[in-house]
Amino acid sequence: MNLMNPQPPADFSQEEAQRYSRNALLDQVGWEGQAGLRAGKVLVVGAGGLGSAALLYLAAAGVGHLGVVDGDAVELSNLQRQILYRTHDLGRRKVASATEPLASLNPHCRVETFDLRLDPGNVREVVQGFEVVLDASDNFPTRFLLAECCWQNQVPLVSAAATGWHGQLLVALPGSGNPCYRCLVPQAPPEKAVPPSAQAGILGAVA
C-alpha cells in the first residue's frame, strides 16, 4: 500500500485494500468514496454492447450490488462488441451468462438478474431499491418508460446510446429545476431516421 494513501477502513480486507488501491489514490474517491461504491446499488438495463462494458467496469470499480436487466439470448453477431460473452455462451440467456465473468472479475460484487423486458407492469418493481439506473437499452419505448419511472421515483438516470461511429450520453438528475429525459428528447425520431438496432452497423469500440 502506498504510504501516501490513507489506510482503508477496518472493514476492508487486505485483498480489498489492494484491489481498490488505485481508486482510493484519487482525491475525488479516497476510501470514503470506495466505501460508498461498495454500498452502492446500480441497475443496468440492457446487457448488450454498452451494458457489457459498463457492467465490467462497475464491478471492477467495486460497486457492491449490480442489477442486470435483459430479455435476450446471446447471438453470434453480439460477440463483436458485447464483451461480457464468449463463443460458448451462444444461445444462453444473457443475464445468466453475464453473472459468471462479473463474479470472476470481482467476487465481492453481488449480481441480481432480471431475465425480462421492461413494461409498465414491472418497471417500478425492478427499479425500486436501486440508487442509480444506467439505461443501455436499444429502443425508445424502453428509454421513455424507464425515464418516466426514474423521474417519478427520484432515481438518477444515466442514459446511453451508440450506433455507427457515434455515442450519446445523457444524465437526468431528479430535482427542482433540472430537465428530465423527455424535456430533451420529447419524442422518438421517425422510424426511417433510425434503423432498428439489429439492422444498424456499429463499431465495437464505440460501445
Where are these regions (language model features)?
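Adenine nucleotide-associated cytosolic modules
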Residues: 1-207
